């Protein structure tokens, strides 16, 4: 009997869904190596492997069988995905076109490392980013540039503005996945995209206000307010938007700063200068990468206090998702300082969830940890922090937490789209 790889759901599923991996038709207690590989849109290769042993019936189920070593060890049913590593260093797995899936090739090889033997079976597994029926609508309204994703069922839906960080451009994959959970989500670009400013030297909150108003006026978005979701600089912008703008009910800040960073922020007659930077505080790792965690000045001292975002003006509810091993900046410190400022002014205490051994890029589930890559503002490779397994577990939990938070504070019902298509 030939060995067969069995996936459930078979064939394809949404990127944020777990897949059950099993092998049948092996010899009793046969040692095998499972290998996963994936190429991103630019052709960069990511790989992971793990050693296993079949049971007495010649079967192997990754939900029951621990990995004996390789890219990971122990009972990790999704390890072959979250443990993927780039063949070349400094490559972060990013999905730029959500209309096409990423294909993972899974292989079963006879024996164990260092030299597993012949290929026993292989299967191609597609993971898509546009859930079935989710509608994708490019947005060019006034100055606003982005993409709106709407669930398949009739609206209106709770609305969310979704923003990424200093890489600029427009990333849609988090918004498209979240639309599959019953939200109307607009991925918003704010610089280095189409006719938007090329740099972050000066950002005007009026632009973001226009985006919020666009979403609130959309016939398939229910008010009276919207949610904000942002990571890194995008998380910091969520704090600024909630502090200065009307129409914001709830905000999720993933590893954001409580100080304005990287450029001047303007709104009407007010200006927030960027917090000061001291490049002498850059450390260098043994791999030669920069560790910039101490580079920014404290927004609690001296002239840098002017960069502190006036969160006490915000009327929205906050959820801070914090990686305690974030090496981009001091995310836990920032979340705690925002909490202190809010409570000192009688505002509602925010929810803060801290994840140990978790780095800067807390992504949707099953994205592999990016250990280091080029930082757009620093101009050289930096480390982002995190340990692969802990970071992977944090991503699964954070994804659930932010959905629960938005459903609670924006209303709506928890919708999920069946995975089988």
Swiss-Prot record:
One of the record's GO cellular component terms: cytosol
Alphabetized SUPFAM superfamilies for the sequence: alpha/beta-Hydrolases
Catalyzed chemical reaction(s): hexadecanoyl-CoA + H2O = hexadecanoate + CoA + H(+); decanoyl-CoA + H2O = decanoate + CoA + H(+); dodecanoyl-CoA + H2O = dodecanoate + CoA + H(+); tetradecanoyl-CoA + H2O = tetradecanoate + CoA + H(+)
GO molecular function, one term: carboxylic ester hydrolase activity
Record carries keyword Cytoplasm: yes
Disulfide bonds: none
Pathway assigned in UniProt: Lipid metabolism; fatty acid metabolism
One biological process term in Gene Ontology: acyl-CoA metabolic process
Subcellular localization(s) per the UniProt record: Cytoplasm, Cytosol
Keyword set, alphabetical order: Cytoplasm, Fatty acid metabolism, Hydrolase, Lipid metabolism, Serine esterase
Active-site residues annotated for this sequence: 232, 326, 360
Superkingdom as given in the UniProt entry: Eukaryota
Transferase listed as a keyword: no
Primary location group: cytoplasm
EC numbers, comma separated: 3.1.2.-, 3.1.2.2
Annotated PANTHER family: ACYL-COENZYME A THIOESTERASE 1-RELATED, ACYL-COENZYME A THIOESTERASE-RELATED
Function description: Catalyzes the hydrolysis of acyl-CoAs into free fatty acids and coenzyme A (CoASH), regulating their respective intracellular levels. More active towards saturated and unsaturated long chain fatty acyl-CoAs (C12-C20).
Similarity remark: Belongs to the C/M/P thioester hydrolase family.
Subunit structure: Monomer.
Protein's recorded name: Acyl-coenzyme A thioesterase 1
């Amino acid at each position: 009997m030939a060995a067969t790889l069995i996936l459930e759901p078979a064939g394809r599923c949404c990127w944020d869904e777990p897949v059950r991996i099993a092998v049948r038709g092996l010899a009793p207690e046969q040692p095998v190596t499972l290998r996963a590989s994936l190429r991103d849109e630019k052709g960069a290769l990511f790989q992971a492997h793990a050693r296993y042993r079949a049971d007495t019936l010649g079967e192997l189920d990754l939900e029951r069988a621990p990995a004996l070593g390789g890219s990971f060890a122990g009972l990790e049913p999704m390890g072959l995905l979250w443990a993927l590593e780039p063949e070349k260093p400094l490559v972060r797995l990013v999905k730029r076109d959500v209309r096409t899936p990423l294909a993972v090739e899974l292989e079963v090889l006879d024996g164990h490392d260092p030299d597993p033997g012949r290929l026993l079976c292989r299967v191609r597994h597609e993971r898509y980013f546009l859930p079935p029926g989710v509608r994708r609508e490019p947005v060019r309204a006034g100055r606003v540039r982005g993409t709106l994703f709407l669930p398949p069922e009739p609206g209106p839906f709770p609305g969310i503005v979704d923003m990424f960080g200093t890489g600029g451009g427009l990333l849609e994959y988090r918004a498209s996945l979240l639309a599959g959970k019953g939200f109307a989500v607009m991925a918003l670009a704010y610089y280095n995209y189409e006719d938007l400013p090329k740099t972050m030297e000066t950002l005007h909150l009026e632009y973001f206000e226009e985006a919020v108003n666009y979403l609130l006026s959309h016939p398939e978005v229910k008010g009276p307010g919207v949610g904000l979701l942002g990571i890194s600089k995008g998380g910091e912008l969520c704090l600024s938007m909630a502090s200065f703008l009307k129409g914001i009910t709830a905000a999720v800040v993933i590893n954001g700063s409580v100080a304005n960073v990287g450029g001047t922020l303007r709104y009407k007659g007010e200006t927030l200068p960027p917090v000061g930077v001291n490049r002498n505080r850059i450390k260098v790792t043994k791999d030669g990468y920069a560790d910039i965690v101490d580079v920014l000045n404290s927004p609690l001292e001296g002239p840098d206090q002017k960069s502190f975002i006036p969160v006490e003006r915000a009327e929205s509810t906050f959820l801070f998702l914090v990686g305690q091993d974030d090496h981009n900046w001091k995310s836990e410190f920032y979340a705690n300082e925002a909490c202190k400022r809010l409570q000192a002014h009688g505002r509602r205490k925010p929810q803060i969830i801290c994840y140990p051994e978790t780095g800067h890029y807390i992504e949707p589930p099953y994205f592999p940890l990016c250990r280091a890559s080029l930082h757009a503002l620093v101009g050289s490779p930096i480390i982002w922090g995190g340990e692969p397994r802990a970071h992977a577990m944090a991503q699964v939990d954070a994804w659930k937490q932010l959905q629960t938070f938005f459903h609670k504070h924006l209303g709506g019902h928890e919708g999920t789209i069946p995975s089988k298509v």
